[in-house]
């Protein structure tokens, strides 16, 4: 868990549901005690049914995403199908472990849907764990206070979205480095979808 000391200024949440995966993140980027952006994207589509959420240095996250997208396209060209979630997580782990002395500063969530929904968390040294739900970043303790009490393996995607928003919102209320809106992505049998700002605000009002 040593890598968490390097990660400030964001909160991400991932949840495995019966029928898909939810990834959420706030939109604030900070440098020290200063907010430097209020509209940062922290969740990225890698392929039709694959995505990465990152907590940490924005430049490092973007560099990793570019590498994963390139490898994913190459895999499709060679094999003729999309990479599995586990394969993408393993690839991410291998890339990170190969840069231990010049690391990507971040904590990464890989979510996807192939034969079933799955979710992996990967630290910047390449340590990998498969999770049912996970949070990373400066507000993770507040997000976990919600997730630990309310998560169920029987949760549906719709209810998983509500739970993820509730968890991120708890971090926004308590963590000064987390804020400025919530990005929500779902991945199910049909593929990757980002909820609109209006959809998220509507769900927030119902909390």
Swiss-Prot record:
**UniProt xrefs under SUPFAM superfamilies:** N-terminal nucleophile aminohydrolases (Ntn hydrolases) (SSF56235)
Keywords, in A-Z order: Autocatalytic cleavage, Cytoplasm, Hydrolase, Protease, Proteasome, Threonine protease, Zymogen
| The EC number(s) this enzyme carries | 3.4.25.1
Q: What is its main location?
A: cytoplasm
What regulation of activity is recorded for this protein?
The formation of the proteasomal ATPase PAN-20S proteasome complex, via the docking of the C-termini of PAN into the intersubunit pockets in the alpha-rings, triggers opening of the gate for substrate entry. Interconversion between the open-gate and close-gate conformations leads to a dynamic regulation of the 20S proteasome proteolysis activity.
Gene3D superfamilies this protein is in? Answer: Glutamine Phosphoribosylpyrophosphate, subunit 1, domain 1
- What Pfam families does the database record attribute to this sequence? Proteasome (PF00227)
Give a yes or no for keyword NADP in this entry.
no
Catalytic residues, chain numbering: 10 (nucleophile)
* Propiece residue ranges: 1-9
Which Cys residues form disulphide pairs?
none
Q: Name one GO biological process term.
A: proteasomal protein catabolic process
- InterPro entries in the record: Ntn_hydrolases_N (IPR029055), Pept_T1A_Psome_bsu_arc (IPR019983), Pept_T1A_subB (IPR000243), Proteasome_sua/b (IPR001353), Proteasome_suB-type (IPR023333)
Query: Which GO molecular-function terms appear in the entry?
Result: threonine-type endopeptidase activity
Reaction catalysis annotation: Cleavage of peptide bonds with very broad specificity
GO cellular component terms, alphabetically, are:
cytoplasm; proteasome core complex, beta-subunit complex
Q: Where does the UniProt annotation locate this protein?
A: Cytoplasm
Q: What class of enzyme is it?
A: hydrolase
Give the record's subunit note.
The 20S proteasome core is composed of 14 alpha and 14 beta subunits that assemble into four stacked heptameric rings, resulting in a barrel-shaped structure. The two inner rings, each composed of seven catalytic beta subunits, are sandwiched by two outer rings, each composed of seven alpha subunits. The catalytic chamber with the active sites is on the inside of the barrel. Has a gated structure, the ends of the cylinder being occluded by the N-termini of the alpha-subunits. Is capped at one or both ends by the proteasome regulatory ATPase, PAN.
Q: Provide the function of this protein.
A: Component of the proteasome core, a large protease complex with broad specificity involved in protein degradation.
What is stated as this protein's family in its record? Belongs to the peptidase T1B family.
Protein name per its UniProtKB record? Proteasome subunit beta 1
- What is the source species? Thermococcus sibiricus (strain DSM 12597 / MM 739)
Source organism phylogeny:
Archaea, Methanobacteriati, Methanobacteriota, Thermococci, Thermococcales
Q: Which gene encodes it?
A: psmB1
């Amino acid at each position: 868990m040593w890598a968490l000391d390097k990660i400030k200024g964001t909160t991400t949440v991932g949840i495995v549901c019966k029928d898909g995966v939810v990834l959420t993140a706030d939109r604030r980027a900070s440098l020290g005690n200063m907010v430097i952006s209020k509209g940062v994207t922290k969740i990225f589509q890698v392929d039709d049914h694959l995505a990465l959420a990152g907590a940490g240095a924005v430049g490092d996250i973007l560099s990793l995403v570019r590498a994963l997208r390139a490898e994913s396209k190459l895999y499709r060209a060679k094999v003729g199908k999309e990479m599995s979630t586990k394969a993408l997580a393993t690839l991410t782990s291998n890339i990170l472990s190969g840069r231990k002395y010049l690391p990507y500063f971040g904590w990464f969530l890989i979510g996807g849907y192939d034969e079933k929904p799955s979710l992996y968390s990967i630290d910047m040294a390449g340590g990998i764990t498969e999770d049912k739900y996970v949070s990373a970043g400066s507000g993770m303790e507040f997000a976990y206070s919600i997730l630990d009490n309310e998560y169920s393996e029987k949760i549906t995607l719709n209810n998983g979205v509500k739970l993820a928003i509730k968890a991120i919102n708890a971090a926004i209320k308590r963590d000064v480095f987390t804020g400025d809106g919530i990005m929500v992505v779902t991945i199910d049998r049909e593929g990757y979808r980002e909820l609109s700002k209006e959809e998220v605000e509507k769900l927030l009002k119902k909390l």
